[in-house]
Every structure is written in structure tokens, then in C-alpha cells.
């Protein structure tokens, strides 16, 4: 049996401990062998990132340099069109074959607006969803049909993620760090310290490049 691997997408503008630490804890909790970080080039749901694709890629390389759990996948950075998760996960499934257990990691805030994503209802055909719980967010979807969809696919057993190739949603109890890329950009713009919010080598690069000023 192939080991469970997961994809973790985002703009990472910049990457910070709020991205990395919960996923490292998650990997230990459920036995993830590999987490593939996939930065977006043109995110459909957000404004264009402030840092360039090359700068965000380099910051990620710095952040995961000493973390063998993580690898970097650049395919979405090489697209000039919006990156739709459903398309990316379909391509990943085709590469990995029908039996490999695959998962996509999202935050609880993303789960609540998941039905607005492009072709959201095809995503579980190709992967599991692992949701990092966040305090203060409700556990129910806003519409009954979407709540029914959640309950239909929900599992409380991490073993299901290893034994099945796709189709399950698992709510993981991961630590919540009150850190966001927006907060970091705002603090940098004001000249405030971000020493405890992101890796030192990433912060040094940001300062060298004069980013987010």
C-alpha cells in the first residue's frame, strides 16, 4: 500500500509559522509521509500577491530547507491563468494512479466557503480533505445541502485516510496560531518586528528585497 501524502496550497505571501507549524503537527497526528506545498500564481479567490512568483517560491524554499516533510511543487506558478484546485487535484490523481491515498489540506474557514469553489463537488473524487480546525469558526455549513454533503463524507478515523484513496473529510485538531500573511505585511509596512511570526531566513530575505514596504 502506498503511504498517504497531502497537498497544501496557498499564496504564501509570505510563508509563515501559521502555515508550517499546524501542518507539521498534523503530519505527526495522522501519519503523513509527505506534504507537497503548491503556491498559486493567480489565485481565483484573492487579489494578486504582492511578492512575485519567484520571490514567493524562494521564500518557501528557505522555509522548508531543513524540513524533510515538505516538498515544493511549482506547477501552478508556471500558469498565467487562475489556478483551480479541482483541476490541479485531478491532474495529481492521474499522476499518482487510482489507488494512492491522497489528501488536500485546508483551513476550517476554507471548508465553510468550499461550495463556492470551482467544481468543488469533484474534488473528493480525487482526494480526501483534511481540515485544520480553527477556534471561533462554526462546524456547520450554512446551507442544509452542503451540511448533508459534509456529513456524508465525514470520518473520525484517520485510518480511513490511509486505507481509501479519496472521498473522506477529516477534521483535525491542530494548533491555531494567530498569524496571517496580512498581519505580517501590515507589521512590516509599519516597521514593526515579525521575528516570532516566520522563519529567520525568510524574514532576512524579505528585508534584503525590501518587500511589503
Curated annotation (Swiss-Prot):
One GO process term, biological-process aspect: NAD biosynthetic process
Keyword line: ATP-binding, NAD, Nucleotide-binding, Nucleotidyltransferase, Pyridine nucleotide biosynthesis, Transferase
Protein name per UniProt: Probable nicotinate-nucleotide adenylyltransferase
Domain of life: Bacteria
GO molecular function: ATP binding; nicotinate-nucleotide adenylyltransferase activity
Function recorded in the entry: Catalyzes the reversible adenylation of nicotinate mononucleotide (NaMN) to nicotinic acid adenine dinucleotide (NaAD).
A Pfam family it matches: CTP_transf_like
Pathway: Cofactor biosynthesis; NAD(+) biosynthesis; deamido-NAD(+) from nicotinate D-ribonucleotide: step 1/1
PANTHER family: NICOTINATE-NUCLEOTIDE ADENYLYLTRANSFERASE-RELATED (PTHR39321), PHOSPHOPANTETHEINE ADENYLYLTRANSFERASE (PTHR39321:SF3)
Catalysed conversion reaction: nicotinate beta-D-ribonucleotide + ATP + H(+) = deamido-NAD(+) + diphosphate
Family: Belongs to the NadD family.
Secretion signal, residue range per the UniProt entry: none
Record organism: Salmonella enteritidis PT4 (strain P125109)
EC number: 2.7.7.18
Amino acid at each position: 500500500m502506498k503511504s498517504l501524502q497531502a497537498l497544501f496550497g496557498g499564496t504564501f505571501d509570505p510563508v509563515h509559522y501559521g502555515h508550517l507549524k499546524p501542518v507539521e503537527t498534523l503530519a505527526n497526528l495522522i501519519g503523513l509521509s509527505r506534504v507537497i506545498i503548491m503556491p498559486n500564481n493567480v489565485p481565483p479567490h484573492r487579489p494578486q500577491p504582492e511578492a512575485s512568483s519567484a520571490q514567493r517560491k524562494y521564500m518557501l524554499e528557505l522555509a522548508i530547507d531543513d524540513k524533510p516533510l515538505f516538498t515544493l511543487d511549482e506547477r501552478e506558478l508556471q500558469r498565467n491563468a487562475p489556478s483551480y484546485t479541482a483541476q490541479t487535484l485531478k491532474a495529481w490523481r492521474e499522476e499518482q494512479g487510482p489507488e494512492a491515498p491522497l489528501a488536500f489540506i485546508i483551513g476550517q474557514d476554507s471548508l465553510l466557503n468550499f461550495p463556492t469553489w470551482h467544481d468543488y463537488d469533484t474534488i473528493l473524487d480525487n482526494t480526501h480533505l483534511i481540515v485544520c480546525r480553527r477556534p471561533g469558526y462554526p462546524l456547520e455549513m450554512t446551507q442544509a445541502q452542503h451540511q448533508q454533503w459534509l456529513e456524508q463524507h465525514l470520518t473520525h478515523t484517520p485510518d480511513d485516510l490511509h486505507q481509501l484513496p479519496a472521498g473522506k473529510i477529516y477534521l483535525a485538531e491542530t494548533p491555531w496560531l494567530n498569524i496571517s500573511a496580512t498581519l505580517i505585511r501590515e507589521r512590516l509596512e509599519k516597521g514593526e518586528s515579525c521575528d516570532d511570526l516566520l522563519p529567520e531566513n525568510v524574514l532576512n530575505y524579505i528585508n534584503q528585497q525590501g518587500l511589503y514596504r
